[in-house]
Amino acid sequence: MTTEAVIVSTARTAVGKAYRGALNNTDGPTMAGHVMAEAVKRAGIAPGEVEDVVMGCAMQQGTMVMNVARKGAIRAGLPVTVAGTTIDRQCASGLQAIAVAARSVMLDGVEVAIGGGIESISLVQNDHMNKFHVVDDELMAMKPEMYMSMLETAEVVAERYKIGRDKQDEYSLECQRRVGAALQAGRFNDEIVPFTTRMAIVNKDTKEITYEQVTLAKDEGPRPETTAEGLAKIKPVFEGKTISAGNASQLSDGASACVIMSDRMAARKGLKPLGIFRGFVAAGVEPDEMGVGPVAAIPRLLKRHNLKIDDIDLWELNEAYAVQVIYCRDKLGIDPDKLNVNGGSIAIGHPYGMTGSRLTGHILIEGRRRRAKFGVVTMCIGGGMGAAGLFEIVH
């Protein structure tokens, strides 16, 4: 009899602004442990029932070094018998972690696992970041595009596929509007677990650092008051180009976790799953246009499950840049009314390793509200890849 992997709970921090937000001084194990503990609590299981923890993290150094999944599990109060591993597929790390955890349930007899993701851009992507030998000279000579910044690749997509600033800003404005409406309706409330932590505050004049206890209960990034005129006034990062702070995802901190178990265990416990993991694929594209990755991954995923674009009721795309969402949406023929229905990372933020897990939790909760059947979580990936995961929503 085939074992199905079902997601029975999800929990995430609110997304904090990198460097100047509430999570700018929160260490990785503590942040990861906070969402793991809450996901276990929401699932109504004993901590010792978890066999393995899989967490995605794109920048595994500093506070995230040496397996933050295992450290987070211990910090969550899970017993030492609970194992942990940390995965890096850049922006798809959180989704990859959920896929690995789900496959362990489907194929290896694991009854309960945690899949999720985490990123602290504040504590890792800073002046202390280890850049020793960050470039392999031989790879640079062979494929220099592997070392392009994500921003540079976004400009390539804009130029190559003729997607202008106006279209990008128009998309971003709609993103902020959708997030604003979702916030008013409380559509993120069931995902977020408030987090009391110690925030670092830097005095602009003296540079002195003080610390303040704060509670983060809502995403810090959204600006629903954004106007078209305001977006148009923001200067592009590169002079004469199209990508600006208004049409790109923000630098952010955050963590998310989902409890995944076998369908038989869920039935035995009388738990009603949020959804069923159905499949995951990754695909490579040219690294200089990494933003188009979903265009390679999604058809592969759908073909393996005998589905078409129109069979999918909800789509969540990581939204690294407006330009890549526009290209992927239009190239694949995705209905805009089914895509990022409550906004995305341009407004909320994009903690690289966390996002895939956040989107999974959100698509399952929103899918249930909308009586949807199938949802796809997808993203572009630094280095030139795309990933996509298929979930069936349970009502």
Name each region found by the language model.
Residues 28-44, 68-72, 97, 150-157, ...:
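Short, well-ordered amphipathic alpha-helical segments that serve as non-catalytic structural scaffolds
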Residues 1-58, 62-64, 68-72, 76, ...:
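Conserved active-site "lid/cap" helical segment
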Residues 12-14, 25, 29-34, 167-268, ...:
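N-terminal extracellular/periplasmic Venus flytrap/periplasmic-binding protein-like
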Residues 55, 152-155, 191-193, 197-201, ...:
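Active-site pocket-lining segment
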Residues 87-118, 158-188, 257-264, 329, ...:
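Active-site-proximal alpha-helical scaffold in enzymes
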Residues 57-111, 145-152, 225-250, 331-359, ...:
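Conserved catalytic cysteine-centered active-site region
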Residues 102, 106-160:
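Flexible glycine-/small-residue-enriched beta->alpha junction loops
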Residues 1-28, 226-292, 296, 303, ...:
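Condensing-enzyme catalytic core mediating Claisen C-C bond formation in acyl metabolism
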